[in-house]
């Protein structure tokens, strides 16, 4: 029988892993779950560590391709340009994230109504873009030019508002800028590696006094749950969106956001 703290860790880990790489906002789901189930403080402390499980999941799934691209970069201009494109897309998040971190954590993360509203609005945008995005010009993530990558990087910064979704912002940005559905998702995966690793390191430093060594068991449960769930999602997502697009996730966001908003307005 799991005790309540271990169950919280398991729930948070599964939520993080299942929602991090699909465009529904893992942070929004975690914060709303924390609010309604009464473990906001636990959610904040565990989230710092379980992010690492999701980071390692995408690194595991893409390890072979990542190593191949890095090895090819010194003599393959296409591979080199792709690595530069990922780093260029990462830079806006570094600058804006460091400058706005305090405000984001202190204000935006404490506003459940904002989170629910952003889930709904993001779902509407995702449904629109899934139908109305221009004809793709880039069917492979490695073909995205640097100026497109930089624009995606700035669009990613919108996801600092909880409920927007990092993967959602980058995928929508990619689709609107000419990436195919699979290419947009794959570039989002690669961009997540430095972005999430950087966010994890920065949050770990900022919350170093919050983490409790006596809770290593619960932390391990959340970490493993996030890792396993994220591996399964990453392996499934590319094939799914290639065949069906992103409408499912738009409706998911609208449904979750609407239920959460109704509950919040009712006083829960």
Swiss-Prot record:
Membrane topology label: Multi-pass membrane protein
Highest taxon of the lineage: Bacteria
Annotated function: Catalyzes the dephosphorylation of undecaprenyl diphosphate (UPP). Confers resistance to bacitracin.
Organism of derivation: Cereibacter sphaeroides (strain ATCC 17023 / DSM 158 / JCM 6121 / CCUG 31486 / LMG 2827 / NBRC 12203 / NCIMB 8253 / ATH 2.4.1.)
Name of the protein in its database record: Undecaprenyl-diphosphatase
Uppermost EC category: hydrolase
A family per Pfam: BacA
Enzyme Commission number: 3.6.1.27
More details: Bacitracin is thought to be involved in the inhibition of peptidoglycan synthesis by sequestering undecaprenyl diphosphate, thereby reducing the pool of lipid carrier available.
Transmembrane regions: 4-24, 50-70, 84-104, 109-129, 144-164, 185-205, 214-234, 247-267
GO CC annotation, single: plasma membrane
GO biological process, one term: response to antibiotic
Protein keywords: Antibiotic resistance, Cell inner membrane, Cell membrane, Cell shape, Cell wall biogenesis/degradation, Hydrolase, Membrane, Peptidoglycan synthesis, Transmembrane, Transmembrane helix
PANTHER family registered for this protein in UniProt: UNDECAPRENYL-DIPHOSPHATASE (PTHR30622:SF3)
Main location: membrane
Family: Belongs to the UppP family.
GO molecular function annotations of the record: undecaprenyl-diphosphatase activity
């Amino acid at each position: 029988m799991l005790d309540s703290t271990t169950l919280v860790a398991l729930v948070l880990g599964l939520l993080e892993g299942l929602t991090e790489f699909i465009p529904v906002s893992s942070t929004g789901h975690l914060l709303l779950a924390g609010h309604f189930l009464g473990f906001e403080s636990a959610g904040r402390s565990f989230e710092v560590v379980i992010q690492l499980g999701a980071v390692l999941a995408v690194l595991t799934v893409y390890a072979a391709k990542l190593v191949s691209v890095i090895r090819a970069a010194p003599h393959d201009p296409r591979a080199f340009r792709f690595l530069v494109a990922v780093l260029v897309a990462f830079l806006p998040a570094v600058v804006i994230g460091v400058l706005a971190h305090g405000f984001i954590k202190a204000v935006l993360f404490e506003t459940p109504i904002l989170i629910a509203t952003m889930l709904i609005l993001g779902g509407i945008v995702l449904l629109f873009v899934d139908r109305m995005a221009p004809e793709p010009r880039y069917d492979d993530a490695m073909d995205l030019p640097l100026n497109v990558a930089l624009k995606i990087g700035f669009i990613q910064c919108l996801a600092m508002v909880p409920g927007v979704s990092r993967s959602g912002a980058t995928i929508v940005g990619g689709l609107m800028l000419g990436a195919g559905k699979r290419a947009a998702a794959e570039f989002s995966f690669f961009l997540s590696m430095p972005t999430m690793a950087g966010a994890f390191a920065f949050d770990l430093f900022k919350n170093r006094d919050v983490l409790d060594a006596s809770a290593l068991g619960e932390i391990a449960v959340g970490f493993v749950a996030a890792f396993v769930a994220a591996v399964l999602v990453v392996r499934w997502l590319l094939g799914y969106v290639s065949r069906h697009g992103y409408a499912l996730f738009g409706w998911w966001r609208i449904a979750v956001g609407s239920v959460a908003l109704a509950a919040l307005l009712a006083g829960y």
